[in-house]
Amino acid sequence: MSDFGARRAHNMDAAVYGARAAVIGGATSTATVLAGQMFDIPVSGTMAHSWVMFYKDEFTAFEKYARLYPDATVLLVDTYDVLHSGVPNAIRVAKEVLEPMGKRLKGIRLDSGDLAYLSKRARKMLDDAGLKDCRIVASNSLDEFTIQSLVRQGACIDSFGVGERLITSKSEPVFGAVYKIAAVEEDGIFDPRIKISENVEKITNPGWKQIYRVYDENHKAIADLLAGRDEEIETSGEVEYVDPNKPWKHRLFT
């Protein structure tokens, strides 16, 4: 188990000393590089979704990463579709990029969806491709109960990255938000980027945006409408609101 909690820690000191406490408590490594430097803790980690989203396609992102870190290539395979895109592209990189260099794919990481099911399917795909030594790392709001459940389900997971449930206490919870690339500027043009996920709430809205805030007759804010940068919203009449997490829920504002 590795400490992945820095971005959800309450401040920098909490991230650094929390990593130290995690290792004292049994974690084998941390993704917080500063803690590794200060306390001689083994450092481990994988790529971020932003790395994958920056490039035009997933294979190119994996290839660039593998060439940069050939001895420690762990690929994050859930940016778009784990079983139909992520794992197949990881296998392709292992065969076409790493093996010609005399290297092996160290691992893949699952960060959303049904981790037990996906890990079993991914394990079979890797084994069938001759990558039985490729490890599977799992993360996504894990705690001791979730990990115990995954083990009981026979999940094919070799290691766990635990963040917010390790580095913060339940009495002082974290704000559940993420920061993803929405667009990449190329020659003055903003090219939209999207994060697809097995968890609907993790799917991002691509492109440069603007926000309209809706107030009621008592001047109380009741909704925010998200629109594209060049999209014009007619505010003199009715405006339809669609809940991004529950698209079947619609509401009209005037």
What are these regions (language model features)?
Residues S44, I108, I136, D158-F160:
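Hydrophobic residues within beta-strands of alpha/beta enzymes
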Residues S139:
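Short hydrophobic "strand-cap" motifs at the C-terminus of beta-strands
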Residues M1-L131, L142-T146, R152, D187:
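Buried, small/hydrophobic-residue-enriched core segments of structured protein domains
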